Amino acid sequence: MRLSILSVFSLVGAGMVSALPQESNLSMKRSDTSECVGPLLCCGTLTTPLDPVVDPLLLALGIDAANIVGSIGLLCHGYEESSCPTKPQCCTEANLLGGTLALGCADLK
């Protein structure tokens, strides 16, 4: 009987530890450009994958917004420090429609 009670407490303890918040991968992506799918980008806007304006476009392209990790960059072009008012973005999933839509984006530090 003691063995089964100890087993239950061990499982509960392991479950509690695994439920603690972990460091986000987003912070690693922001400083590591090796995961970018192309050049650094200058995006007019960064939005969430579940944005009601972007969601129909994603659906039309056959992309499930729930599977996107990071932000969505809109109206992106190659980053040039002299002509970009924002921080450069690293997009790790896709750059679609000539930069109109970039997936998995995050600002670089």
Curated annotation (Swiss-Prot):
Keyword check for Nucleotide-binding: no
Subcellular location: Secreted; Secreted, Cell wall
UniProt entry keywords in alphabetical sequence: Cell wall, Disulfide bond, Secreted, Signal
Main location: secreted
Effect of disrupting the coding gene: Disruption of all 7 hydrophobins leads to altered germination kinetics, decreased survival under exposure to extreme cold stress and increased mycotoxins patulin and citrinin production.
InterPro entries named among the record's database cross-references: Hydrophobin
Example of a GO MF term: structural constituent of cell wall
Transmembrane parts of this sequence: none
Extent of the signal sequence: 1-19
The keyword Nucleus appears for this protein: no
Cysteines engaged in disulfide bonds, as pairs: C36-C90, C42-C84, C43-C76, C91-C105
GO CC term (a single one): fungal-type cell wall
General function of this protein: Aerial growth, conidiation, and dispersal of filamentous fungi in the environment rely upon a capability of their secreting small amphipathic proteins called hydrophobins (HPBs) with low sequence identity. Class I can self-assemble into an outermost layer of rodlet bundles on aerial cell surfaces, conferring cellular hydrophobicity that supports fungal growth, development and dispersal; whereas Class II form highly ordered films at water-air interfaces through intermolecular interactions but contribute nothing to the rodlet structure.
Family indicated by similarity: Belongs to the fungal hydrophobin family.
The protein, known as: Class I hydrophobin G
Organism: Penicillium expansum (Blue mold rot fungus)
Recorded name of the encoding gene: HfbG
